[in-house]
């Protein structure tokens, strides 16, 4: 208030709404944010009632204070600000940004403990590489965090791919139950 600028005050609290990538994107558009952290027992309820704009939680577990959640919040918001990352489009491909988990990453060497980098990734065929990445992203999300798919923008091809995964998974489960 002293500067005359409006400040959005966030209190890091296990009682707040769970932080999501959607909320991070929204917060990245707010010019002035201050983060309030409690320690052990939290902060005075009157402060929350009178000056806190929003309570945010980073998950359902106990920490000694709000400092680590505040760092998580600050880091996730800063990644959305143009110029923070070397490639401003890089964050759009990462897990959670578009309600999908990120595709698998591979580095050198080509062969590590008998496991090789998928051939499509070294083929140089960019269209096939993009298709592979999209399908692996869909597959990972389907297998590990299917709850996220409801928020994803899916093309007709994506839906067909996921239907194929459902059928494959259903068939595998049937085969296992017959053993």
Q: Model-flagged regions — what are they?
A:
Residues 12-15, 37-40, 59, 66, ...:
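Fold-independent oxyanion-binding glycine-rich loops
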Residues 129, 133-179:
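C-terminal accessory regions appended to core domains
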Residues 15, 23, 43, 52, ...:
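Glycine-rich, flexible loop/turn motifs
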Residues 1-39, 82:
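S-adenosyl-L-methionine/SAH cofactor-binding core of RNA-modifying enzymes
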Residues 96-151:
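Long, charged alpha-helical interface segments
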Residues 36, 40, 57, 81, ...:
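Short glycine/serine/threonine-biased micro-segments
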Residues 4-5, 29-30, 51, 56, ...:
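Short gly/pro-enriched beta-turn/loop segments at secondary-structure junctions
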Residues 43, 47-96:
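Structured adenosyl-cofactor binding patch, chiefly the S-adenosyl-L-methionine
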């Amino acid at each position: 208030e002293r500067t005359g600028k409006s400040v959005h005050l966030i209190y890091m609290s296990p009682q707040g709404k769970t932080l999501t990538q959607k909320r991070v994107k929204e917060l990245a558009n707010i010019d002035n944010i201050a983060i309030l952290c409690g320690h052990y027992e939290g902060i005075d309820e009157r402060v929350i009632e009178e000056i806190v704009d929003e309570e945010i939680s980073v998950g359902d577990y106990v920490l000694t204070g709000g400092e680590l959640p505040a760092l998580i919040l600050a880091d996730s918001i800063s990644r959305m600000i143009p110029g923070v990352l070397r490639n401003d489009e890089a964050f759009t491909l990462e897990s959670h940004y578009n309600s999908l988990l990120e595709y698998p990453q591979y580095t050198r060497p080509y062969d590590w403990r008998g496991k090789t980098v998928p051939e499509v990734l070294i083929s140089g065929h960019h269209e096939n590489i993009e298709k592979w990445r999209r399908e692996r992203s869909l597959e990972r999300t389907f297998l590990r965090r299917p709850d996220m798919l409801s928020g994803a923008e899916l093309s007709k091809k994506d839906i067909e791919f996921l239907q194929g995964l459902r059928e494959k998974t259903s068939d595998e489960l049937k085969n296992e139950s017959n053993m």
